[in-house]
Amino acid sequence: MKFLEKLKQAGNRNKSLLCVGLDPDPKLMPVGMSALEFNREIIEATAPFVCGYKINLAFYEALGKQGWEILSETCEFIPRELITIADAKRGDIGNTSKAYARAILDELDCDGVTVSPYLGYDSLEPFIEYQDKGIFILCLTSNQGSTDFQMLKTEYLGQKRFLYEVVADKASLWNRYENIGLVVGATQQEELKKLRLSYPKLPFLIPGIGAQGGDLKATIENGTNPNGELAIICASRGILYARSGSEFAQGAAEAAEQMRDAINHYRKRF
């Protein structure tokens, strides 16, 4: 099944654009609980309210030699009707890029992955050639330092354009399999609106809601397409750690349901 088709089906099933980030932090998890058990309970509690899950590979790499096993088993826990996106931000050349793609899209069998465009098309091609997978290119990120490079102006097709605009245009040109999307932060509302108007058919993976300060109402208004779709709204800490102790899973379920419902409230205009 093509990524966009699966995304639409998952969104319709749960009436949701919400994507929960599975970022297990031992300092915030219940004392004595393993990352695998934490993830399992979070998935079971939140699955009715989401379109999918975003797994930040760094949190698993930080767990040492057992991290990959936890990551793999976490992917297996996620219901197959929901999407799984590996937040890996990979970007390298030649066989290295091919190996990254195999690890994430074959071995883990994730539905999508985040990639960095800094090394150019040949670094992304091994991912893009997985025609049924969603390839999300970092375009305009939610962190403060994004302006260091992404907002620089450069000459492109005879015009002065911001670098993030060049990335978006290149992504659109590379989208021959209709499997490419953009990562655009919810902290960049003016630019988010501009990108959506320019690329109404690309899915946007949108981090930055909650702890990073992104406004949910503005994100839905600016980040969805004319049908109120093609935006994957990411939330992690505000859901995973909504409550502490033994009630963490119930707290996550309630937080996910509330965010799903808030998103749908703002989608009503569509």
UniProtKB/Swiss-Prot annotation:
Q: What is its EC number?
A: 4.1.1.23
- Choose any GO biological process term that the UniProt entry carries and state it: 'de novo' pyrimidine nucleobase biosynthetic process
What's one Pfam family the UniProt record gives for this protein?
A: OMPdecase
Pathway-wise, it operates in: Pyrimidine metabolism; UMP biosynthesis via de novo pathway; UMP from orotate: step 2/2
Q: What GO MF annotations does this protein's record show? A: orotidine-5'-phosphate decarboxylase activity
Reaction catalyzed: orotidine 5'-phosphate + H(+) = UMP + CO2
* Active-site residue list: 89 (proton donor)
Q: Which InterPro entries match?
A: Aldolase_TIM, OMPdecase_type-2, OMPdeCOase_dom, RibuloseP-bd_barrel
Q: What is the protein's name according to its record?
A: Orotidine 5'-phosphate decarboxylase
What is the organism field in this record? Dehalococcoides mccartyi (strain CBDB1)
Q: Which gene produces this protein?
A: pyrF
